[in-house]
C-alpha cells in the first residue's frame, strides 16, 4: 500500500501522471481512496487508481492494461513475498525500476525476476529501507509547509502503557501505523472508534480527539 509514499508522490513539485495503488485488503483500499479522492487528483492532472489484485484472475494483465500497455516507470514492492516480487517485475516498463522496500527477515528469501527485460528493456532493481538525512529534512520541510500529511498513515493512538501489548500483537492488529504518546496513559484506540470510546469510557478527551480527526 504505502500511504506515506503515496502522499509524497502526489504532493511534490515533480509529480507522476499516473499512480496505481494495489492491495489485497479492500478496507485498506477504501480508506486510501477516501483520503485521496480520485476526482480531486484528476483535476490536478494525475490519474489515480485503487486496485484490489486479489479479486483479479490475471493481475499482471489488468495492471498492464491500466498503464496503457507500456508498463510502469517505477514499481514499489512493500511485501517480501516471492509472488509479489515477480508480479512487480512483470509490470515494469522500459527502463523501469523495481524498488524493493520490504526488508525480508529470511536470509534465503529469493524471487523470480525477468532477466530478458533486464538485458533488453533496461529494467533494474534497488532495495531501500527509508530515506537518507537529506530526504528526512525534505520530508519535514514538506510537512511543515502542509504539502504532505503524515497523519494519513496513522489508524490507532495509545499511551505508553499500551506500547508493549501493541508491539507484541502488531501482526494481529489491522490498519496502519500505531501512534504512541509517551506522556499519556491510554489504551490503544482506533481513530474511527474514538467517539464510541468517549461514550464507553465517559471521557470527553476521546470526543475532542474524534472532533480533530473528523475536521
Task: Outline where the language-model segments fall.
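C-terminal hydrophobic helical "lid"/dimerization subdomain
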Residues: 34, 39, 57-61, 86-90, ...
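Adenosine-nucleotide cofactor-binding segment
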Residues: 6, 10-84
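Glycine-centered, small-residue-biased loops immediately flanking beta-strands
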Residues: 17, 96-97
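Helix-to-beta-strand junctions that scaffold the AdoMet/dcAdoMet cofactor pocket
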Residues: 92-94
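Rossmann-fold NAD(P)-binding glycine/threonine-rich loop
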Residues: 82-86, 90, 102-122, 134-138
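Short, acidic/turn-prone active-site loops that include or flank metal/cofactor-
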Residues: 48, 54-56, 102-107, 130
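Short beta-alpha connecting loops at secondary-structure transitions
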Residues: 100, 120-127, 150-151
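Residues forming the Rossmann-fold NAD(P)(H) cofactor-binding site
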Residues: 3
Amino acid at each position: 500500500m504505502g500511504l506515506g509514499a503515496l502522499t509524497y508522490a502526489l504532493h511534490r513539485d515533480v509529480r507522476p501522471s499516473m499512480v496505481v495503488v494495489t492491495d489485497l485488503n479492500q478496507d485498506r483500499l477504501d480508506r486510501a481512496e477516501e483520503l485521496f479522492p480520485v476526482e480531486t487528483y484528476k483535476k490536478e492532472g494525475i490519474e489515480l487508481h485503487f486496485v484490489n489484485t486479489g479479486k483479479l484472475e490475471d493481475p499482471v494483465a489488468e495492471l498492464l492494461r491500466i498503464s496503457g500497455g507500456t508498463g510502469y516507470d517505477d514499481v514499489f514492492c512493500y511485501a517480501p513475498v516471492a509472488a509479489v516480487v515477480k508480479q512487480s517485475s512483470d509490470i515494469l516498463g522500459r527502463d523501469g525500476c523495481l524498488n524493493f522496500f520490504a526488508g525480508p527477515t529470511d536470509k534465503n528469501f529469493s524471487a523470480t525476476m525477468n532477466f530478458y527485460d533486464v538485458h533488453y528493456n533496461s529494467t533494474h532493481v534497488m532495495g531501500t529501507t527509508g530515506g537518507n538525512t537529506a530526504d528526512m529534512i525534505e520530508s519535514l520541510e514538506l510537512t511543515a509547509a502542509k504539502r504532505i500529511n503524515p497523519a494519513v498513515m496513522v489508524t490507532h493512538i495509545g499511551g505508553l502503557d499500551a506500547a508493549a501489548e501493541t508491539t507484541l500483537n502488531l501482526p494481529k492488529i489491522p490498519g496502519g501505523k500505531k501512534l504512541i504518546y509517551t506522556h499519556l496513559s491510554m489504551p490503544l484506540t482506533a481513530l474511527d472508534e474514538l467517539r464510541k470510546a468517549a461514550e464507553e469510557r465517559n471521557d470527553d478527551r476521546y470526543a475532542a480527539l474524534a472532533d480533530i480527526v473528523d475536521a
